[in-house]
């Protein structure tokens, strides 16, 4: 190619479904995905392409591990950051194309020397999630290593509305409009394409010397292409006719040669995955990447094989078609399967390009055992440990379909994918249960369940509850003064708020929930809870189990405090926190968090009395009775019991205690009985009436003041 042709030719290397981090726990296959991605980047450097185009699923997990992220960043740094000049320009509005904090293509940043730009959309494995709608690719984008595009903001009502803005590139006389569409749930995107004006395509504006028809239009998407169920896939005929070339991700079978779609005028390439993640027939085909050279409105594809991919051999056998197998003899079945496996291993070794780096092959045999007995696949694979990479799942058994149910007679609507079928069943079960909930909408629980199971979001349900509670609080606070509500009126008001929120949700897309949070930490929890004005108190039991932020306490003091908190659970007063972090915890129940009080006077009095008695009981529960059981004259009498003297002497010494951990030292009485006595006396204190609260408070203060020397002695023994 001459220098003039090179200056007008845009060279692009296309790859999809790298699945970095796949099988990272497997000692044999843990490096396969990284070696394949390293080879792809090396090919891009060797072929001197203008940029690398990735079609989604760069990562295998929605939350990749730190090891996976570090290795991915290392590979991109080695191959993308250099002093090579970038030969093309981005002439479109970059703030629209790249929706991040910087809003520009990475090679235009003056602080970075980017020699190989990488453009990528997200797939179904690494799609954005959480309150901030971020994905793992956003991390690479923030590192200025990847240009992340194709992230759609679903707006409008019903199924939603999306607008696709192209990245306009120009190299010499060649102009390219690159459209990106990150993964959207197939059923929803299918409905959107069939809804008028739900999907809008923005075309380049007419400029001097450049008409709209002069642009070469490329689309990169990551969706189902299989025709098994039309509702769970995207048809090529949904796409606009002005497109010239389509890169189709998500399908792992390598169909790298561009195929023309009849009646549409564009070509489709399906590069497939660079690492085998499902051991099926389609994955056994050789893996390739595509070198796409564009000049004007013409393009030239060149497929390049990947040599670092682990060899994979797949075959299917029907036992009844084999004449040398006895249906009643298991040994004959084993001998035949052993022979097939050995042949596949030998076949894989012959395909090895570099003999010095022969890898253990992947072997999969699909066995139709109709009329025969099965064998244990794991026991069968034990003899091939060290010979194949997947000894635990070499065999997969199946039976022939019943008569009259051939594949030709199966309707397309009945060919549901197993994972899609199960997902529909889960949603249907939740919907059919008809839960009569007053705060949480069922749709929000569906989304939380999806993120908890599929995206490993451990705080999905907690975020769902917190978001709906805050939304309910806000609506109640806007209506009227919360303190004027009675309990019955509050329940009715909450029900009305739920109906209003359900109406609002019905006008918004189902996937636009704001409560999901995949990155909640203790700092975020503290910030979020502090924003709720005058409506929170420490809930030791619930918040400690939910977030695990309350620090452990020492001795009986912490346990007695927890007991007093449980004893006051019915009173809408402030509870005592166990540590500094407990002040940031908020109870997730509605009544307490809103701060409704049935009787403010009695509640405040009970709270002060409970606080004083709780501190006394918590510090003196080793061998002193409750404040109600002790008469005033008893405090003036000396302790004549030898048992008390011994316990007092023991407390004065700092020697190893023989009692249990966290209990009072030197006490010979039953700790459980003391604990019950203190909690029962506290309950009696809290149940006192308003008419005699003042007298009780005065008597109680006198008793507490008199018992202070005893408390001080025990407190010093417990603190050590």
Curated annotation (Swiss-Prot):
Residues 503-720 are annotated as: Disordered. Binds 2 manganese ions per subunit. Its cofactor is Mn(2+). Residues 596-615 have a biased composition (Low complexity). InterPro entries: Calcineurin-like_PHP_ApaH, Metallo-depent_PP-like, Mre11, Mre11_capping_dom, Mre11_DNA-bd, Mre11_N. It is found in: Nucleus; Chromosome. Residues 567-579, 650-664 have a biased composition (Basic residues). Residues 508-537 have a biased composition (Polar residues). Keywords: Chromosome, DNA damage, DNA repair, Endonuclease, Exonuclease, Hydrolase, Manganese, Meiosis, Metal-binding, Nuclease, Nucleus. The active site is at residue 125. GO terms for biological process: double-strand break repair; meiotic cell cycle. The keyword Nucleus applies. GO terms for molecular function: 3'-5'-DNA exonuclease activity; DNA endonuclease activity; manganese ion binding. Component of the MRN complex composed of two heterodimers RAD50/MRE11 associated with a single NBS1. Core component of the MRN complex, which plays a central role in double-strand break (DSB) repair, DNA recombination, maintenance of telomere integrity and meiosis. The MRN complex is involved in the repair of DNA double-strand breaks (DSBs) via homologous recombination (HR), an error-free mechanism which primarily occurs during S and G2 phases. The complex (1) mediates the end resection of damaged DNA, which generates proper single-stranded DNA, a key initial steps in HR, and is (2) required for the recruitment of other repair factors and efficient activation of ATM and ATR upon DNA damage. This is Double-strand break repair protein MRE11. It comes from Arabidopsis thaliana.
């Amino acid at each position: 190619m001459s220098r003039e042709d090179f200056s007008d030719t845009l060279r692009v290397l296309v790859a999809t479904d790298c699945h970095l981090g796949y099988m990272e726990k497997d000692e044999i296959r843990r490096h396969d995905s990284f070696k394949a991605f390293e080879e792809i980047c090396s090919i891009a450097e060797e072929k001197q392409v203008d940029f690398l185009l990735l079609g989604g699923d760069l990562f295998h997990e929605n939350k990749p591990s730190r090891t996976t992220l570090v290795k991915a960043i290392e590979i991109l740094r080695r191959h993308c950051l250099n002093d090579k000049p970038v030969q093309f320009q981005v002439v479109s509005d970059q703030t629209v194309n790249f929706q991040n904090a910087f809003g520009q293509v990475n090679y235009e940043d003056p602080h970075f020397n980017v020699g190989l730009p990488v453009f990528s959309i997200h797939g179904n494995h690494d799609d954005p999630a959480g309150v901030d709608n971020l994905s793992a690719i956003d991390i690479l984008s923030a590192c200025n290593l990847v240009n992340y595009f194709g992230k759609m903001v679903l707006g409008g009502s019903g199924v939603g509305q999306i607008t696709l803005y192209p990245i306009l590139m120009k190299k010499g006389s060649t102009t390219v409009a690159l459209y990106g569409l990150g993964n959207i749930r197939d059923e929803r995107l299918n409905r959107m394409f069939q809804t008028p004006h739900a999907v809008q395509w923005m075309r380049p504006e007419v400029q001097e010397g450049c008409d709209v028809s002069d642009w070469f239009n490329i689309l990169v998407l990551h969706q189902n292409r299989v025709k098994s169920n039309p509702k769970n896939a995207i048809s090529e005929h949904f796409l606009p006719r002005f497109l010239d070339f389509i890169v189709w991700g998500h399908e792992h079978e390598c169909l790298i040669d561009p195929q023309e779609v009849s009646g549409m005028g564009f070509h489709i390439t399906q590069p497939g995955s660079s690492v085998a993640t499902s051991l099926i027939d389609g994955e056994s085909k050789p893996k390739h990447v595509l070198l796409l050279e564009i000049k004007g409105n013409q393009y030239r594809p060149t497929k390049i094989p990947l040599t670092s991919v682990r060899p994979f051999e797949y075959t299917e056998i029907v036992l009844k078609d084999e004449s040398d197998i006895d249906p009643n003899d298991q040994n004959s079945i084993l001998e035949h399967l052993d022979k097939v496996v050995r042949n596949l291993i030998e076949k894989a070794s012959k395909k090895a390009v570099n003999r010095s780096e022969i890898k253990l092959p992947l072997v999969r045999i699909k066995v139709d055992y109709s009329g025969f007995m099965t064998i244990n696949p794991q026991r069968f694979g034990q003899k091939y440990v060290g010979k194949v990479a997947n000894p635990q799942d070499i065999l997969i058994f199946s039976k022939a379909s019943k008569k009259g149910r051939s594949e030709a007679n199966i309707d397309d609507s009945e060919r549901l994918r197993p994972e899609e079928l199960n997902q529909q069943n889960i949603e249907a079960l939740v919907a059919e249960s008809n839960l009569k909930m007053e705060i949480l909408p069922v749709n929000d629980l569906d989304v939380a369940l999806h993120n908890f199971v599929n995206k490993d979001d451990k705080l999905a349900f907690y975020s769902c509850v917190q978001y709906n509670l805050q939304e309910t609080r806000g609506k109640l606070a806007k209506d009227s003064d919360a303190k004027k509500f009675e309990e019955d009126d509050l329940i009715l008001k909450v029900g009305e708020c739920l109906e209003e929120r359900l109406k609002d949700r019905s006008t918004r897309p189902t996937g636009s929930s704001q409560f999901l949070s995949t990155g909640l930490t203790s700092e975020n929890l503290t910030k979020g809870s502090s924003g709720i004005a005058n409506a929170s108190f420490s809930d030791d039991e619930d918040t400690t189990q939910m977030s695990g932020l309350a620090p452990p306490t020492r001795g009986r003091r912490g346990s007695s405090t927890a007991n007093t908190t449980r004893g006051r659970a019915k009173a809408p007063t402030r509870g005592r926190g166990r540590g500094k972090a407990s002040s940031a915890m908020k109870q997730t129940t509605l009544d307490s968090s809103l701060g409704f009080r049935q009787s403010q006077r009695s509640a405040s009095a009970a709270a002060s009395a409970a606080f004083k008695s709780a501190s006394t009981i918590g510090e003196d529960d080793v061998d002193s009775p409750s404040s109600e059981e002790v008469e005033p004259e008893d405090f003036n009498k000396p302790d004549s019991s030898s048992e008390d003297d011994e316990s007092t002497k023991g407390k004065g010494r700092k020697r190893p205690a023989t009692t249990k951990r966290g209990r009072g030292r030197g006490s010979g009485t039953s700790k459980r009985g003391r604990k019950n006595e203190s909690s029962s006396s506290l309950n009696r204190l809290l149940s006192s009436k308003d008419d005699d609260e003042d007298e009780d408070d005065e008597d109680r203060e006198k008793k507490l003041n008199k018992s202070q020397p005893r408390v001080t002695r025990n407190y010093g023994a417990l603190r050590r």
